[in-house]
């Protein structure tokens, strides 16, 4: 029997063991999509205790605590931090089979050197031990990033953000990691969203452009894209909960924009038209600047109205959507490809039923120049599990090129989440090892090792081409 989460955790054959320890384990990390705070990175934020580092803002953990019967006061409420931690310690043993069980122990092992299993009995001692370490040297936000061998961090930023801390970090020669902005213009595309006119005003202020027409709106967006570019930004991200496409013209999109600013209700069809044209415009801009565009598709957000009113968004009340994506997605990609304006694109869906839709579609839009120009993004959110990762990788390898996959990201708000890359890398190595053991792939360790290192780091390095000397990538 294998020891619990020992050195060969998830590595079930000799080839996998060799690939992980000799090729994958020490590769650097490019975290090209996350929700870390650039302010906290710049200030090298320290944590008062393990609850602040682990449980604040982590809706993954909150969801299973609720499922375990933990009252909200111990999750997002006003219970003391030690009691919140003990509520988590009570939940962890019940989470076997959930990746959080493994991630929790990986984080304890890698960052704190704690190999004890977390439960109610060990909770008090682990609370004291982790807190003692957190109050010492080497546990600030920057320290945790450096300790994880991260070279690039791409945050998620609104177009109206000042990027103040990105710019300060860019000039900070004492920190060897590039912290780059990620352009997230969702508030500018959801025209029926409450607060849209106010956001347009914020965009006007940020871009220093008067916005009374759709033309001016697009000019302001372009100005902000170029500002992000000057700060080192090379990625955009779009939360497209429902994939839409509706053929339209710039004039019609302009009419819809004007109607909304004047308080007229925008129909569902007009909303689709506005989003379509604005996305097409942004695609052309991203292509010009050689950015990578990310689509996160098919999330069903804020499904519990009572708790949404009580706690707000991003608190653990989202789920998978099951909208059809194939036709609107291909129509959008095709519409910009026809104009030679399709940028590098990474497609994620929260619904695993879309795996083969995406895996098959991406190769319809490869350009024969950039390897893996259109990517099937790594398993996301509820699919960020051993089975979910394997399903995504197998779909990609069955109909595309697994070897050109740009690999893992954290998509996290926690500075302790970089062990997810280790979890992912072990799964990659074991999958390839299984192919070898089954006689499906030759045991050419030089070839397989280079493929593993590509998926871990090298492919992302060549794909994004982040221009930042201090990152040394």
UniProtKB/Swiss-Prot annotation:
Q: Which InterPro entries match?
A: Metal_Hydrolase (IPR032466), Uronate_isomerase (IPR003766)
Pfam families, alphabetically? UxaC
The protein's induction, as recorded, is: Induced by galacturonate, repressed by glucose.
Biological process according to GO: D-galacturonate catabolic process; D-glucuronate catabolic process
Record's superkingdom?
Bacteria
Q: Which GO terms describe its molecular function?
A: glucuronate isomerase activity
Which EC class heads this enzyme's classification?
Answer: isomerase
User: Which reaction(s) does its UniProt entry say it catalyses?
Assistant: D-glucuronate = D-fructuronate; aldehydo-D-galacturonate = keto-D-tagaturonate
Signal peptide segment: none
The EC code for this enzyme is 5.3.1.12
Instruction: Describe the family membership recorded for this protein in Swiss-Prot or TrEMBL.
Output: Belongs to the metallo-dependent hydrolases superfamily. Uronate isomerase family.
Q: What else is known?
A: Member of the exu locus which is required for galacturonate utilization.
Q: Any idea what this protein is called?
A: Uronate isomerase
Organism lineage string = Bacteria, Bacillati, Bacillota, Bacilli, Bacillales
């Amino acid at each position: 029997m294998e020891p619990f989460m020992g050195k060969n955790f998830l590595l079930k054959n000799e080839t996998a063991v060799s690939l992980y320890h000799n090729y994958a384990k020490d590769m650097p990390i490019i975290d090209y999509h996350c929700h870390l705070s650039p302010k906290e990175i710049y200030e090298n934020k320290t944590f008062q205790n393990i609850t602040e580092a682990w449980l604040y803002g982590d809706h993954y953990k909150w969801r299973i605590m609720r499922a375990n019967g933990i009252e909200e006061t111990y999750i997002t409420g006003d219970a003391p931090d030690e009691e919140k931690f003990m509520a988590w310690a009570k939940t962890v043993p019940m989470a076997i089979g959930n990746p959080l069980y493994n991630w929790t122990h990986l984080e304890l092992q890698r960052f704190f050197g704690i190999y004890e299993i977390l439960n109610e009995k060990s909770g008090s001692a682990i609370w004291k031990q982790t807190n003692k370490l957190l109050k010492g040297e080497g546990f600030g936000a920057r320290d945790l990033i450096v300790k994880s061998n991260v070279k690039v961090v791409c945050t998620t930023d609104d177009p109206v953000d000042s990027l103040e801390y990105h710019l300060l970090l860019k000039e900070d020669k004492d920190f060897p990691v590039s912290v780059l902005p990620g352009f997230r213009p969702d508030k500018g595309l959801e025209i029926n969203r409450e607060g849209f006119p106010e956001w347009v005003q914020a965009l006007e202020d940020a871009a220093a452009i008067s916005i009374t027409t759709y033309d001016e709106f697009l000019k302001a967006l372009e100005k902000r894209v170029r500002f992000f570019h000057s700060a080192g930004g090379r990625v955009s991200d779009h939360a497209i909960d429902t994939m839409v496409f509706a053929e339209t013209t710039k004039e019609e999109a302009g009419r819809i924009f004007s109607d909304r600013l004047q308080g007229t209700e925008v129909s569902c069809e007009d909303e689709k038209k506005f989003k379509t044209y604005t996305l097409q415009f942004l695609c052309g801009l991203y292509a010009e600047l050689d950015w990578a565009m990310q689509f996160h598709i098919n999330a069903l957000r804020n499904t519990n109205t009572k708790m949404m009113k009580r706690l707000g968004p991003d608190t653990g009340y989202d789920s998978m959507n099951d909208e059809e994506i194939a036709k609107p997605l291909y129509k959008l990609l095709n519409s910009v490809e026809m104009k030679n304006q399709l940028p590098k694109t990474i497609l994620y869906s929260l619904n695993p039923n879309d795996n083969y839709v995406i895996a098959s579609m991406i190769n319809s839009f490869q350009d024969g120049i950039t390897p893996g120009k259109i990517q099937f993004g790594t398993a996301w959110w509820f699919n960020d599990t051993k089975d979910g990762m394997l399903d995504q990788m197998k779909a990609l390898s069955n109909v595309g090129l697994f070897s050109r996959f740009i690999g893992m990201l954290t998509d996290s708000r926690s500075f302790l989440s970089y062990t997810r890359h280790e979890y992912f890398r072990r799964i990659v190595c074991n999958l390839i090892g299984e192919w070898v053991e089954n006689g499906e792939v030759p045991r050419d360790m030089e070839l397989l090792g280079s493929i593993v290192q590509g998926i871990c780091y090298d492919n992302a390095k060549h794909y994004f081409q982040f221009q930042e000397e201090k990152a040394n990538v």
